[in-house]
Amino acid sequence: MNEAETRAELIDPKLKSCGWGIVEGSKILREYNITAGKIQTGGIRAKKLTADYVLVYKGIKLAVIEAKSDDLEVGEGVAQAKQYAEKLQLETTYSSNGKEIYSICMKTGAEGLVDDYLTPEELWNKTYPAAGSGNNTVAELADAWRVKFADVPYEDKSGTWQLRYYQEIAVRNTIEAIANKQQRILLTLATGTGKTAIAFQIAWKLFQTRWNLSAGQAGLKPYVARRPRILFLADRNILADQAYNAFSAFPEDALVRINPKEIRKDGRVPTNGSIFFTIFQTFMTTSKKIVEEFKEARLAEAAEASYTSYNFGQYPPDYFDLIIIEHSSAYAHTIR
């Protein structure tokens, strides 16, 4: 049989018998495009990377399968299976010729022939080992939020746009860190790789699930189901404006552009909204001419007064549930 026949007659039935596409929440993505192909000299693209199967459960990609004709040895697909799993940062990957299944764990390095594919629940528990413990542990609470976040689809502009594979990985890893209550997260990406798009999708999932600091701490317990307050900080107005415009899929009343003129006009910083955009310089502005005096005085009371005199000091501690910093190395001293 050729590869297409091998898939239809041997691999597909095997996946079905293991619950894939049958168990609620499980899905099989076929001919999944990982990359469009590297752009080469003259604008010609290299061959795109396409995975034969990607196994999805509870909205999260868990494994990839490289299929080969039953006329070939199962080992023929191992290198590709590893390459695709590495690209997608998946722990589990398979190569199959329909007659045999070769399993690879990218995390431990364990690999070899197996009788069956892992079921959706088995693969989930392998990827997130503490999730199936049945205890109300931090891991169990993280798993609850992991599922909530995964239930929210990426905003794709009515199907006209989709995340690149590395952008999806960045969003997934960030959301995973948030689910695990990690307080600081650093994403390092080159210019032009879509940092704002990544920030948007992270904010989108938090906004739609009504995640906030109290909710994240409560886990499975009752909590105040309010929209998160998110601050987007940039070092230049053009970047803050671009981000504000890029977040247009959010409700209009959720977006707030903080600027000095409105602060001077209203006499206070804005608080009515969910996602706030501004620059460091605006937040570090003070309307009082006492900062230098406070610095010289070095008194606790003076330090407190100095803090509240800045625009950022008008917000209560932990007012923002998430702060996204558009980091630029030229302004590293400002960020510190």
Predicted features and spans:
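Walker B catalytic acidic pair
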Residues: 279, 326-327
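Short, hydrophobic beta-strand segments that form beta-sheet elements in well-ordered domains
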Residues: 93, 256-259, 325
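A glycine-rich phosphate-binding loop feature that marks nucleotide/adenosyl-phosphate handling sites
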Residues: 188-193, 234-235, 262-266
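ATP-dependent helicase/translocase motor core
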Residues: 1-63, 68-229, 238, 242-253, ...
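Conserved helicase ATPase motor motifs in RecA-like P-loop NTPase domains
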Residues: 190-191, 327-331
